[in-house]
Amino acid sequence: MKREKRTYREMWGKMISFFMYDGMKKDEYATIQGEIYEKNLRNMTIYSSVSAFLFLGLYISSYLIDSIIGNRFLYLIQFIVSFLVMCAFRTIAQNHRAAGESVKYIFEVSLLSFGIVLGAIKSPEAEAAVFIVLLVIIPMMLYDVLLFSVLIRATMIIVYVVIALQTKDMGYCSLT
């Protein structure tokens, strides 16, 4: 009986280590945490800058291309969010680690929300690829994927599936 309890504790400890400290021991993770934060900050600054310019380009293109005119408001909102996140990464996040982590998660949620609105609400059958691509790309930009980030993605997947199933039953809706 003692051996089973110890085995479960060891397994639980390994799971916690994997999700909380990226598979390392707590002290090993603590030694490289500053470097990870700097690399994540650099990557998220680049990613939010590219995202802001991409959404600005899509917003401008929506005046020229009739097929994306219905998403103009979404592009504008996501451009504003991406621009504000870019500014936050370049200013506030440089000096305040907690603020930088919060902004990182806010940016992740905003991108996944954009994918949900575009994919699940606007047309669940045709544009689900946007949400899936964002689910794949966002973790590739980070050096460590902690438990909170995994929980955000799991929650957004559940929200996406529920909304997609409901809008599929009700028919498509338009946000414009």
PLM ranges: what are they?
Residues 1-35:
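Non-catalytic regulatory/interaction regions at protein termini and inter-domain linkers
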Residues 2-5, 26, 39-42, 81-85, ...:
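Intrinsic low-complexity, intrinsically disordered segments enriched in polar/basic residues
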Residues 2-5, 9-13, 135, 140-176:
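N-terminal membrane insertion elements
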Residues 29-39, 117-122:
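Generic hydrophobic, helix-prone segments enriched in Leu/Val/Ile
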Residues 36-48:
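N-terminal membrane topogenic signal
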Residues 47-137, 156-161:
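Hydrophobic transmembrane alpha-helices and their membrane-interface boundaries in multi-pass
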